[in-house]
Amino acid sequence: LNALNVVKLLTIWVFLLISSVDVGAASKKGLQPQLAISPSRIVLESDEVNATKSVTVLNLGSKPMQVEVSVQNWDFDEDNNYRALPPTPQSLDQWLIINPVRLTIPAKGQQTVRMAVRPKAKPEDGEHRAMVFFKQLRAEEAKGVNVLFNVGVPVYAFFGDVKREAAVHSMTFNKENHTFNFDITSSGNTYVRPEGFYMIVDADEATEQEILQRLNGENGEVKGDKPFASGKVTSKPVFAGERRKVEAAITLKEDIKKALSSQYALAVKIDVAGTLFEKVYYIQQDK
């Protein structure tokens, strides 16, 4: 095979926040994503499983693009990386009806793909999941080295008596890489995920309780003076019956890092399976 005809396949897993890491890595290499999907995650609650869901496939490039759609059963391996699994009678990949499965999208254009769930067996209570892939196909006239994007969109469907239950064994913050670390067991029949908001202010601004009162745990709004930084916290899911350590990083711009005092307060409000966890971390940093 001639080296000039080698096709490089760049796979981008689009899981809530995980995708941005891979897209960022591609950008650092000078590779701008040509394919985008919205929304990046599909959820059908128990009262929606008979509904049809739609996703929009966008061609961000300057040439027409062909895209092929496929579906897999999946989970995470021990390192929290995507792992393809064989189908089972209860896996959602066996129940999804997708139309169309091959698209031709004009430059800077978009197309809609519809999905419906049609169970082939009586669904067990709880979560059923699949990963739907949108793979950019190599153009026949393409020459040289090509970068093709393969975007995965997780689809979750919930049936019957859904139990979101979890035990949070620990929640810590690593100041070196600005990352929250969670140790969580999902004891129900569906995944759980730590989701919430953070805010950074001066450490001597107020008491811990007063700092927490400024941060709205439902929408992330901040009362009073503008904080140094604020934003959303979310991580990969922990699937039913599993105990996992998951991470959620926050991104601080360089000018914000320089503006921080030698000691600052990081307030966080995190929801895990309906339980709210509130905490203020006092961070000492070297100047």
Q: Which residues does each PLM region occupy?
A:
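Terminal connector regions
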Residues: 72, 118-156, 252-287
